[in-house]
Amino acid sequence: MTKSHALAARILTLLEPRACPGNAPGTLADAHTLWGPDGQCTLRHLHYPPMSAARAASLPPGSWRAGAHTDWCCVTLLFQRVGEFGLECAANPRHGATEWAPVDPVRGGVAVNVGDMLSRWSDGRLLSNLHRVRMPAPKPETGEVPVRYSLAFFMQADKSAMIQCAEQPPITAGDYILGRIRSNFEK
């Protein structure tokens, strides 16, 4: 988790001049502590279980394992296992794209997603990317859908960090996350 945090902090440092040109260098990275009561960074183990041939055959065409969504954090690092496919990103999201591009695992590679928090912080200079996990094709020899494992590190700013931008009112990262959680239950 420490190495993931360091990598995400480095990515934020590299993005900052473009994302938040008025910031002092290091402002974004410094707003993300890994440990302590103010920290909100999270490491999540994602498991999509295998499915029997009968269960897989009962699903409608175009089913997915995780529906289209964006991440709430600043940056997500996704570690995928080689040979376990399914992650897709919307192509050209500024234009309401319905086409999806696969993000196949690469040995030693890490998929990086910009999240909603960084999109807000940057006044939309960086867009959070819409992504999903599609249902892979069943194995031809068995008809079963294979398992998928991945690790996601969500680099979320500290609860007390102030997200300030020109287009929207300031909000603490803690209140931002609480607002996102609440929005799930108000629909």
Residue ranges and their predicted role:
Residues 5-187:
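C-terminal flanking tails of non-heme Fe-dependent oxygenases
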